[in-house]
Design a protein with these regions (language model features):
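Conserved phosphate-binding loops in nucleotide/dinucleotide-binding enzymes
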Residues: 415-430
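Structural alpha/beta core scaffold segments of enzyme domains
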Residues: 1-416, 437-445
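Hydrophobic alpha-helical bundle architecture
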Residues: 421, 443-449
Length: 449
């Protein structure tokens, strides 16, 4: 049967759990661990300093996982607030909305003379969109098992970057990289989260204190949600000019967000980090639109926040496709055109995209009557050379939104295993609906609540 990271068992293994800084950047001031140490099975209580990859924490090592988790609850930790102690996502959103209009931006894609088209068109649209921070929330919480002995290190961890695991394990254990053995079991969901090295550094640090003893560190679900590297919060300002017949004369998008790539590089490869680096992931899905928009510009306003961000399933496309397709709908409405037909017109030079759009609309019976309170929407995106169109049928009752059906058409080229493609698409639909309706991460007074 499949072995995941949490299934790993090594002879003589002990177990660890931890509590991490409650606010971004906080450090440990003091620890009262008397009650925790008195619990049966507890072997050690360890203060873990903050690193470039991980928050400050206090860990308990015990004979069993439950003993470690229970002892963590008995810890009395005093924390010294850090620079992120006052951070608030409501205030951040207000600041982003201002920056979307006035911030200094870097241009990623430009063609034609969009500003001329925006000067005095028959129809002008100017819209703001916003998405929150999102956690990865993989089904299997973070875990790693490490063994340090005789100048070597062995580690078992579900991961998306074994070379980085080797580097960071070697540095933490203070052994040569060629003395590190990395085992990569199945991982219970990655989505970009398991390219990070926080749990690796923490597990190896604990194992180094207990030479010859394998230590399995398991994060609780609460720690997993409060100490993710999140999909960035982002605000977009989208402007378009339409002529009197509803044709797009100009299209300008500006996104305000942190840099996923810059944040990740700063944690994992700090020597390569540079403020001059342009992060294409911040605007992917906007600078590479398939639509016929000869007068366009896509630009990014870079921000820096105490909230760590990283790669999240589909990265920039996860929010930029939403921005672009929502605005296409607004343009269609302003032009008094059907959203499907409006897109077909914009795809006159993109036959593959147009075929996918038409397939989704046909399979969904686009234009068929709907019951009162129900609606139907369509969207198209290309991400990593795969073209996807979806039609969603929804029902609104008061404040409740119910998704009744999603029809999806995909052109990914040659499908070597169609069942895997189907599984990925079905999972992506559920993932996207969860993100849109339920996934918001809120920060108050520097803490995820």
């Amino acid at each position: 049967s499949a072995i995941f990271g949490g299934d790993v068992r090594v002879p003589g293994q002990v177990y660890a759990a931890l509590v991490q800084a409650p606010t971004f950047g906080a450090t440990v001031a003091s620890v009262d661990d008397n009650v925790a140490r008195s619990r049966r099975g507890v072997k050690d209580v360890v203060v873990l300093s903050a690193t470039a990859t991980s928050a400050a924490a206090v860990a308990v090592v015990a004979e069993r996982t439950w003993q470690a988790l229970a002892a963590v609850a008995d810890l009395r930790v005093e924390w010294t607030p850090g620079p992120g102690a006052t951070h608030d996502t409501d205030a951040q959103r207000a600041r982003y909305e201002s920056l979307a209009r006035t911030g200094e931006a870097r241009v990623f894609d430009a063609a034609g003379t969009p500003d001329l088209g925006l000067a005095a068109p028959p129809i002008l649209l100017d819209s703001l969109y916003h998405v929150p921070y999102l956690a990865h929330a993989a089904m299997e919480p973070l875990n790693a098992t490490a063994l340090v002995r005789d100048g070597s290190c062995e580690i078992w961890v579900g991961n998306q970057a074994p070379t980085l695991v080797r580097w960071f394990a070697a540095k933490t254990a203070d052994v040569p990289a060629d003395r590190v053995t990395v085992h990569t079991p199945y991982l219970g969901g990655g989505f970009g989260r398991r390219v990070e090295m926080d749990v690796v550094v923490q597990a190896v640090t604990l194992a180094k204190r207990m030479p010859g003893v394998p230590v399995q560190l398991v994060w609780s679900r609460e720690e997993d949600m409060r100490h993710d590297v999140y999909r960035p919060m982002a605000t977009a300002r989208c402007r378009a000019a339409l002529d009197s017949r509803g044709n797009v004369m100009a299209w300008v998008t500006r996104v305000v967000s942190q840099s996923c790539t810059g944040s990740l590089v700063g944690r994992l490869l700090p020597a390569a980090a540079s403020d001059a680096m342009k992060d294409r992931t911040a605007l992917e899905g906007l600078f590479d639109l398939p639509y016929d928009l000869p007068h366009r510009r896509a630009e990014h306003v870079l921000t820096r926040e105490p909230v760590p961000v990283g790669y999240w399933r589909s990265v920039g496309y996860s929010h930029n496709a939403f921005f672009a397709e929502s605005f296409v709908d607004e343009c269609a409405h302003a032009a008094k055109r059907d959203p499907f037909e409006f897109r077909r017109t914009l795809l006159r030079h993109a036959p593959r995209h147009r075929a996918v759009l038409e397939a989704a609309a046909a399979r969904a019976d686009w234009g068929a009557p709907l019951a009162s309170g129900q609606g139907r929407g369509i969207a198209l995106a290309e991400s990593y050379r795969t073209i996807v169109a979806q039609v969603a049928e929804v029902e609104v009752r008061g404040a409740e939104v119910r998704v009744l059906r999603v029809v999806c058409a995909v052109d990914c080229g040659f499908a070597l295993d169609p069942d895997i493609v189907r599984a990925q698409i079905e999972g992506g639909i559920v993932f996207g609906l969860t993100a849109a309706l339920l996934g918001e991460i809120t920060v108050k007074k520097g803490a995820v609540i």
